């Protein structure tokens, strides 16, 4: 046992914890100047995943936008897990005059909504009992009532939320169980061009495609229509191309991103090799050839027309000191989300921080969100409100935030 090495590791961990506490204190002190909107809520259990629903209602007379969010739970051992639907009322920024933060609660340590006329309302409106942790949750683009999850038990599940009451039942009963993976996973993506089609990826190194049209009510189970296996490395993420029925990209622990076409006998048509394990992939919704890859060390942009060299890489741009950021920050991207309103803007999350990038600028780093005290599990851009972002972390917190100050 190397006592000296253990002590060095302990001191390094304590240093990082103190640094995070100092960063969070400064963030809380300055938050009133940094955001047009900031909502923080402490959840009962951490959520590993978050997604805005693609349906929103505008209440014009109240200047309110009624949104919904999908969340999960990562409960303690022996405690039940739930798929959760949350209602969120936000101010309509086109009708409301915004004011700096006035609603910080000293007792709870929570920040509320920041408009002059409205407080933002958040509540869990529906909970559905789930088998295992909700590793990932996504709704069908063509029908937001149909929800898919990836579970820590290895299976994927489909729920029609209209078939469940607001309070959870005592028995776990999904509408469909997707049977095929042998280990847990986090890769999950619906096909935006083909109704009822989705793809999953897991630690068993498999990528499976599913067609819900093949579902039989007699068994309530479904087997995959396609099975792809590249190597023995865990596949961490997968996403269909938003404008193409047959294309998707997946990434794995070996740092390989494989571009796949399910019409081909050899499904993988091209690959990109990174120097670190890859955890996230996202296609740009506006630029058909552009996609982003994220690892714990860097964020990379690639163009499908030229896979010989990345368009942008944070580790390379840091080496020439073009990005003016503290050296302790790791500009990786274990979770990524492109803006639906601005083609050059993406948010990445790594460790306790979220980074907003605008690649239409010479210095692309626009904003750093330092409000979380635990590792950020997932980030998601609001599809309706430009620059509004949701993030969830291991500190049990959900943050809804819209930056006010853009740092150049």
Curated annotation (Swiss-Prot):
WD repeats lie at residues 129-169, 180-220, 230-269, 273-312, 330-369, 371-408. One of its GO terms (cellular component) is CAF-1 complex. It comes from the Eukaryota. GO terms for biological process: DNA repair; DNA repair-dependent chromatin remodeling; DNA replication-dependent chromatin assembly; mitotic recombination-dependent replication fork processing. GO terms for molecular function: H3-H4 histone complex chaperone activity; histone binding. Its main location: cytoplasm. SUPFAM superfamilies: WD40 repeat-like. Keywords: Chaperone, Chromatin regulator, Cytoplasm, DNA damage, DNA repair, DNA replication, Nucleus, Repeat, WD repeat. InterPro entries: Histone-bd_RBBP4-like_N, WD40/YVTN_repeat-like_dom_sf, WD40_repeat_dom_sf, WD40_rpt, WD_repeat_RBAP46/RBAP48/MSI1. SMART domains: WD40. It is found in: Cytoplasm; Nucleus. The keyword Acetylation does not apply. Disruption phenotype: Viable. Component of chromatin assembly factor 1 (CAF-1), composed of pcf1, pcf2 and pcf3. Interacts with pcn1/PCNA during S-phase. Interacts with swi6 at the G1/S-phase transition and early S-phase, but not in the G2 phase. The CAF-1 complex interacts with histone H3-H4 dimers. Belongs to the WD repeat RBAP46/RBAP48/MSI1 family. Acts as a component of the histone chaperone complex chromatin assembly factor 1 (CAF-1), which assembles histone octamers onto DNA during replication and repair. CAF-1 performs the first step of the nucleosome assembly process, bringing newly synthesized histones H3 and H4 to replicating DNA; histones H2A/H2B can bind to this chromatin precursor subsequent to DNA replication to complete the histone octamer. Plays a role in the maintenance of heterochromatin. This is Histone-binding protein pcf3. It comes from Schizosaccharomyces pombe (strain 972 / ATCC 24843).
